[in-house]
Amino acid sequence: MLKQRKETPKSSDLPIYLFKQGNNQEAYRYFGAHLCEQNGEAGVVFRVWAPHAKAVSIVGDFNSWTPGEHPMEMVTDGIWERFVPGIKQFDVYKYCITTPADELVYKADPYAFHTETRPSNGSKVYDIEGYEWGDAAWIKDEQKRDVINSPMSIYELQ
């Protein structure tokens, strides 16, 4: 069942405020691609933070990867949003960002719940509501671990 689209948050709303402070631990619930319904039409609302972009659009198989066909609107402080009707689960997409130097850069969604298998790197629309997590044993073991004196892994992502 598709969720009803909520109003676009104002810059003073708590999730946006916490995001700006670096304290929104559930930013994934707002940013990324979310299946929903708007005015009775099923589709996806996309949100991304691109504070220095001149423009952002959504590209994918659904628009033949055409920049500008689905332009996003900056709703507040570098947060861009767009509802696109007709997009379904597993549809592949990227953000096409126009830089201040007018270059087009294609970026995967940093909040994507699903991605293509390498060497491809597109994001996929995926609804995690109702997903059955299978990590209860790991979480139980993790709660017993001494995090201060245990080794840690650091990954560099580009």
Question: Residue ranges of each PLM-predicted region?
Answer:
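Short beta-strand elements bearing conserved aromatic residues within extracellular beta-rich modules
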Residues: 56-58, 93
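Structural beta-strand segments of beta-rich domains
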Residues: 42-46
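Short proline/glycine-enriched turn/loop motifs at strand-loop junctions of beta-rich domains
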Residues: 49-56
